[in-house]
């Protein structure tokens, strides 16, 4: 299982996504790729924050009709076990003086709960969290 971080999905939604990201995703088995509910929320927020217009509508369609359905049965929730993992991740990061955002800690907690890997374009926070 590999969780795709929000920045990977954002990259795939660009008009001209990074060839290396597209190539990497294409080499993976679809059944091994997952999203978290946090990524859904972050993508939807990013789109909702745009001014109303064609770009916002196009991104909404691209996500809701294109990307989102591809993961319909592969979306991981934040549950009670993830809340335990979240608390540990944040506490350990604080003790070490490492910055770990709420969003990264929430996604990291889901990753830990399901014992999977994370694919991200920003490895720093996740490496610092021991993922």
Describe each region flagged by the PLM:
Residues 1, 32, 103-104, 123:
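A short, glycine- and basic residue-enriched loop/turn
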Residues 37, 122-123:
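Short secondary-structure boundary segments
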Residues 22-26, 108, 123:
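Short amphipathic alpha-helical segments and helix-helix/interface helices
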Residues 128-131:
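Beta-alpha-beta core module
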Residues 9, 40-43, 83, 126:
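A generic structural signal for short hydrophobic patches within well-formed alpha-helices
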Residues 1-39, 47-66:
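Short, well-structured N-terminal submotif of metal-dependent ribonuclease cores
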Residues 45-51, 69-121:
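Active-site neighborhoods of divalent-metal-dependent phosphate/nucleic-acid chemistry enzymes
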């Amino acid at each position: 299982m590999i969780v795709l971080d929000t920045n990977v999905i954002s990259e795939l939604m660009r008009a001209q996504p990074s060839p290396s990201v597209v190539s990497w995703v294409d080499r993976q088995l679809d059944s091994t790729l997952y999203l978290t509910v946090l990524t859904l929320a972050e993508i939807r927020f990013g789109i909702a924050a745009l001014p109303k217009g064609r770009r916002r509508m196009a991104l909404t369609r691209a996500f809701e009709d294109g990307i989102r359905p591809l993961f319909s049965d592969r979306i991981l929730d934040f549950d009670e076990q993830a809340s335990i993992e979240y608390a540990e991740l944040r506490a350990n990061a604080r003790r070490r003086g490492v910055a770990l955002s709420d969003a990264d800690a929430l996604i990291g907690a889901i990753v830990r709960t399901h014992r999977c890997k994370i694919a991200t374009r920003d490895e720093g926070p996740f490496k610092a969290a021991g993922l």
